Each structure stands twice: as C-alpha cells, then as structure tokens.
From Swiss-Prot:
Protein name per the record: DNA terminal protein
Gene name of this polypeptide: 3
Renumbered residue ranges of the record's region Interaction with the viral DNA polymerase: 256-258
Record's subcellular location: Virion
Source organism of this protein record: Bacillus phage PZA
UniProt superkingdom: Viruses
Lineage: Viruses, Duplodnaviria, Heunggongvirae, Uroviricota, Caudoviricetes
Residue ranges, annotated region (Priming): 173-266
Length: 266
C-alpha cells in the first residue's frame, strides 16, 4: 500500500490551525471557569509540525471542530441552582430514557387494566378500578417515573441514581427480573409468617411451581395475594391463616385453567 505523502504546511493551514487551537483552548478555559469541568483530556492539541500527513491533520481538524461546535451537546453543560453540573447530552439521554420507561409502564398498565380482580372469591371490579382506589405502583408493583427535571436534582449521587435507574428500566428484561423477584419476595413473606402450619407449607410449594409471569398476573388480580396479609419477620396479621386457605383455593382454580391469564408474556 502506498504511503500518504508528507503534509506540506500552507499559510491557510497555519491560519486554520491557529483558529482551532484558539477556540479549543478558549472552550476548555471557559468550561473550567463556568462549570468546574476540565475538558483538557478530551482533545489533544499537537504542534502543527507533528502532523505527518494531510489525513492526520484533517482528522484532528474534525475533532477540534466537533469539540468546539455548540451543537455538540456532549460538551455543552448546564448548572442548576444546587450546583449540580451535567452535560446537555446526559440530560437529554435521561429525559429520553425516562419517557421510554413511562411508555413501557403505560403499555403494561393498559394491557392489564380491564382484567377483573377478586377479593373473597368474588369479582370486585377491574384492575383499573382497583388502581383508582390506590395507585398504579401499589397494585402493579411497577413505579411510573415522573418527568425528569434537572432543575430539581440536588446532588450528583441523585443524578447518577436517576441515570442508572432509567437506563436499566428501558431493558425489557428488567421487568422479567422484577416478576421473578416479586414472586420470591412473596414466598419469603409467607415463609416468615409461620413457624409450623401445614397449609402454609402447601401454599409455599404451590407458589414455587407457578411460572413468574403467571404469578404476576395472579398477584394483580387476587387481593389476598398481598404482602400486607403476611409479615416476613414471623408476625402474622389478623385472619392470615384463613387467607392461606383462600389463596390455595384460587390456585386450585388456576390449575384447572379457570383464570384467563392472557397477560402471559406481555
């Protein structure tokens, strides 16, 4: 392969190099002074004579132009009233991810809202009506985040938490893991409520047999399958033993196929 010819530095090259160096240094100094962010490691400023080929020089010019371009949100920053600084690119990313999480949560709630829920063995209305009496998070175990508002972020740790949480929750596998963890937590709650109770032992074994997505829909639709009815520290609430028998009765109906679990895999 033929080697690229060594660059011949022209007057217009010198002028453009000087302009880009000036703008780059000014950008670094301005950002450091205004936001306390040191960008000096983000771009090199080599001597003009160090470029061996025109291709090398052109590549550096592109990098320097991008670095100083106000449209490059990666190097544009905002500082809120609490002194928290973030790039506009990061703020925009968290906003996008938050909107996507809201969309996913709304999609899941809309898929289940018309389903009947049961209490005392009888239909008591729809899941949407149940949500209206409490909250979506209370019924579904899924929290719908509020719109991201950078002006209200008080600390960098809070910003990192929001960034990581929203990014994680855009992954569909997050909700699959949530269903698995919800089932495990409920089984643990039942286990912690009794020292010795045969019906509870039977319930625990039956719960372990249920696929996580089926359990999640049963959790949504049966009021007795509730953490409020059990206590994982070993203390029981009133009528909890009777509640065990009610859940076993529901699970018998589930095994017979009496529940239309059409949310499976949603």
């Amino acid at each position: 392969m033929a080697r690229s010819p060594r660059i011949r530095i022209k007057d217009n090259d010198k002028a453009e190099y000087a302009r880009l160096v000036k703008n780059t240094k000014a950008k670094i100094a301005r950002t450091k002074k205004k936001y306390g962010v040191d960008l000096s490691a983000e771009i090199n400023i080599p001597d003009l004579e160090s470029f061996e080929t025109r291709a090398q020089f052109n590549k550096w010019k592109e990098q320097a132009s991008s670095f100083t371009n106000r449209a490059n949100m990666r190097y544009q920053f905002e500082k809120n009233a609490y002194g928290v600084v973030a790039s506009k690119a990061k703020i925009a990313e968290i906003e996008r991810n938050t909107k996507e999480v809201q969309r996913l949560v709304d999609e899941k709630i809309n898929a289940m809202k018309d389903k009947e829920y049961y209490a005392g063995g009888k239909p008591q209305g729809t899941i949407e009506q149940r949500i209206a009496m409490t909250s979506p998070a209370h019924v579904t175990g899924i929290n719908r985040p509020r719109d991201f508002d950078f002006s209200k972020v008080r600390t960098y740790s809070r910003l990192r938490t929001l960034e990581e949480s929203m990014e994680m929750r855009t992954d569909p596998q997050y909700y699959e893991k949530k269903m698995i963890q919800l089932q495990l937590n409920f089984i643990k709650s039942v286990e912690g409520s009794f020292n010795s109770f045969d019906a509870a032992d039977e319930l625990i074994e039956e719960l372990k047999k249920i696929p996580p997505d089926d359990f999640y829909e049963l959790f949504l639709r049966i009021s007795e399958i509730s953490f409020e009815e059990f206590d994982s520290e070993g203390n029981t609430v009133e009528n909890v033993e009777g509640n065990v028998y009610k859940i076993l009765s529901y699970l018998e109906q589930y095994r017979r196929g009496d529940f239309d679990l059409s949310l499976k895999g949603f």
